[in-house]
Curated annotation (Swiss-Prot):
Residues 93-96 are annotated as: G3. Mg(2+) 1 binds at T23, T46. It comes from Sulfurisphaera tokodaii (strain DSM 16993 / JCM 10545 / NBRC 100140 / 7) (Sulfolobus tokodaii). Belongs to the TRAFAC class translation factor GTPase superfamily. Classic translation factor GTPase family. EIF2G subfamily. It catalyses: GTP + H2O = GDP + phosphate + H(+). Residues 44-48 are annotated as: G2. Zn(2+) binds at C59, C62, C74, C77. GTP binds at D19, H20, G21, K22, T23, T24, N149, K150, V151, D152, S184, A185, L186. The gene is eif2g. Its cofactor is Mg(2+). HAMAP family: eIF_2_gamma (MF_00119). Residues 184-186 are annotated as: G5. One of its GO terms (molecular function) is GTPase activity. This is Translation initiation factor 2 subunit gamma. Heterotrimer composed of an alpha, a beta and a gamma chain.
Length: 418
């Protein structure tokens, strides 16, 4: 016997400043080291979005929080009675380095809740702690847990002093009541209390499976090894998260904006890609249908050359019959709001007004594109995009970043008008 093989039902982001122990924390909970990319292993930092899953269970014989486990046995009491399965969750490990803010923002679009990891042995808040916190608020994350990591390398007094600083920082913000849970990810101390916190504070959202399915793409790849005979080639794979509705094997889908074509005279157009879903998997689990929660890999009939090296990242997948999705080269943003200060730099710089002709970076869902500010009046902003954005609903929030001292910095957000 073991726990049921099911897809994850909730996505939990793991965010915070570089080197504060995000990837180590994910490993402590799931047993998976999410940095797999060769460059990541060499540089010791997360570059792409990492991913891992964990099943959560509770031992009927132990007291809480020790009763919470992520394995099909309890090391605490050694009882023959197996822990009861509660749910499967997935973790999206976002990069903490300042140059990778766009990657963090594209991951935030998939999150149902988040763990903000703070190192107890560094001054609080660090620049990306602050920037990630603001970003989570902008993309409307409601469920947050602050994880005070590395408490094993500071005294009790230092840990308590920082706890008070965190409380002070949260006061008056969207996350004023967020719980703060101290852990040592390296020594796996208090991980059971964190799992209890995840169960209590990051519930699985209510999902409406009758809605038109929408999937945000964060990966795409060719699974064929070099030299595979032509008649054995497998179609391209797209990976991402379904944010509403459900997809099934055999569904005909379209991928937007699609393939880029350069026309004579330098004009660029995008053509939607149409294909059929041939397989669906979550990590090692093959399923017939996929719902929101977890990162799903869709096998398709696409030519593998279309998906190579994450070329479809930022795309949106819908059913081929869906006519309610717009692909926009010109974005009208209303009720846009700028932060008072640029939060991700060491010094807090005042945010200047957006100027006509300024190049901005916009993030919507898992897509990031550059654009030029054209018309600005009151709280409305029009931006001409270098690559079109796919708008799948009304009142979507777009995140606005601009170059500050050679780095893209989060400066505001607005609502897309369609």
């Amino acid at each position: 016997m073991s726990w049921p093989q099911v897809q994850p039902e909730v996505n939990i982001g793991v965010v915070g400043h570089v080197d504060h122990g995000k990837t180590t924390l994910v490993q402590a909970i799931t047993g998976v080291w999410t940095s797999k990319h060769s460059e990541e292993l060499k540089r010791g930092m997360t570059i792409k979005l990492g991913y891992a899953e964990a099943s959560i269970g509770v031992c009927p014989n132990c007291n809480k929080p020790e009763a919470y486990v992520t394995e099909y046995s309890c090391n605490q009491c050694g009882s023959d009675e197996k822990p009861q399965f509660l749910r499967k969750v997935s973790f999206i490990d976002a990069p903490g380095h300042e140059i990778l803010m766009a990657t963090m923002l594209s991951g935030a679009a998939l999150m149902d809740g988040a763990l903000l990891v703070v190192a107890a042995n560094e001054p609080f808040p660090q620049p990306q702690t602050r920037e990630h916190f603001v970003a989570l608020g902008i993309v409307n994350i409601k469920n947050l847990i602050i994880v005070q990591n590395k408490v094993d390398v500071v005294s009790k007094e230092e840990a308590l002093k920082q706890y008070k600083q965190i409380k002070e920082f949260l006061k008056g913000t969207w996350a004023e009541d967020a719980p703060i849970i101290p852990v040592s990810a390296l020594h796996k101390i208090n991980i059971d209390a964190l799992i209890e916190g995840i169960q209590k504070y990051i519930p699985t959202p209510q999902r409406d499976l009758s809605k038109d399915p929408i999937m945000l793409v964060i990966r795409s790849f060719d699974v064929n090894k070099p030299g595979t005979p032509y008649n054995e080639l497998k179609g391209g794979v797209i990976g991402g998260s379904i944010i509403q509705g459900k997809l099934e094997i055999g569904d005909e889908i379209k991928i937007l904006p699609g393939l880029r074509h350069e026309k004579p005279g330098g004009k660029v157009e995008y053509e939607p890609l149409y294909t059929t879903i041939t397989s669906i998997r979550f990590s090692d689990l093959e399923v017939k249908e996929a719902k929101p929660g977890g990162l799903v890999a869709l096998g398709t009939e696409l030519d593998p050359s279309y998906v190579k090296a994450d070329s479809l990242v930022g795309s949106v997948v819908v059913k081929s019959s869906n006519k309610n999705v717009s692909v926009l080269w010109n974005l009208k943003i209303e009720n846009y709001q700028l932060l008072e200060r640029v939060v991700g730099a060491k010094e807090l710089v005042k945010v200047e007004n957006i100027k006509k002709g300024e190049v901005l970076m916009l993030t919507l869902g898992s897509a990031t594109t550059l654009g030029v500010a054209k018309n600005i009046k009151n709280d409305e902003l029009e931006v001409e995009l270098k690559r079109p954005l796919v708008v799948w609903d009304k009142d979507l929030r777009v995140v606005i970043s601009r170059q500050v001292s050679g780095r893209w910095r989060l400066v505001g957000w607005g609502i897309i008008k369609i």
